[in-house]
């Protein structure tokens, strides 16, 4: 059973058939440069309407940037979005994701990673951008 709201705010329930696929790759071009990419696709069918859901992205990582153990990273891509919907009123704007972060290795066991994420058109709504600040602390045991 699926419970969700459509673009018009109406609650929908019912069975859904989902076929999902994904691919990812990472290429270490040098000890200081890593490129990665991913893509996903899902076909959702509730036997009345059909939706295609896509996401994809590219990333660049610079290991040991500034100091051994640190990492500078950038990600650009599309948040999951509906395309090819047969449901009237479904938004068609693609929500893009831009991210930058810097992992600073404090010592062998603790790192702190500040970052910023900018998402354009979240929820596939035009002119509704979001900027998110992040701080992650990792403790390694």
Labelled PLM ranges:
Residues 61-108:
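C-terminal hydrophobic structural anchor segments
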Residues 17-21, 50-56, 94-98, 128-133:
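Residues that define the transmembrane beta-barrel architecture of outer-membrane proteins
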Residues 3, 32-37, 65-72, 106-114:
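Repeated loop/turn-to-beta-strand initiation elements of outer-membrane beta-barrel proteins
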Residues 3-11, 41-48, 79-86, 119-124:
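Sequence/structural signature of outer-membrane beta-barrel proteins
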Residues 27, 62-64, 104, 118, ...:
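Residue-level signature of outer-membrane beta-barrel architecture
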Residues 60, 129-141:
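Outer-membrane beta-barrel "beta-signal"
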Residues 22-42, 112, 134-138:
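Surface-exposed extracellular loop regions of Gram-negative outer-membrane beta-barrel proteins
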Residues 37-41, 58, 74-78, 114-118:
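Transmembrane beta-barrel strands of outer-membrane/channel proteins
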């Amino acid at each position: 059973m699926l419970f969700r709201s459509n673009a018009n705010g109406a609650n929908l329930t019912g069975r859904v058939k989902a076929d999902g696929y994904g691919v990812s790759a990472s290429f270490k071009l040098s000890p200081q440069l890593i490129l990665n990419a991913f893509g996903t696709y899902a076909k959702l069918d509730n036997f009345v309407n059909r939706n295609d859901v896509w996401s994809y992205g590219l990333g660049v990582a610079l290991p040991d940037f500034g100091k051994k153990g640190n990492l500078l990273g950038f990600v650009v891509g599309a948040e999951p979005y509906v395309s090819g919907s047969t449901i009237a009123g479904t938004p068609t704007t693609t929500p893009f994701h831009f991210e930058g972060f810097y992992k600073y290795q404090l010592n062998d066991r603790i790192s702190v990673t500040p970052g910023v994420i900018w998402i354009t058109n979240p929820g596939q709504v035009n002119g509704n951008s979001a900027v998110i600040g992040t701080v992650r602390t990792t403790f390694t045991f």
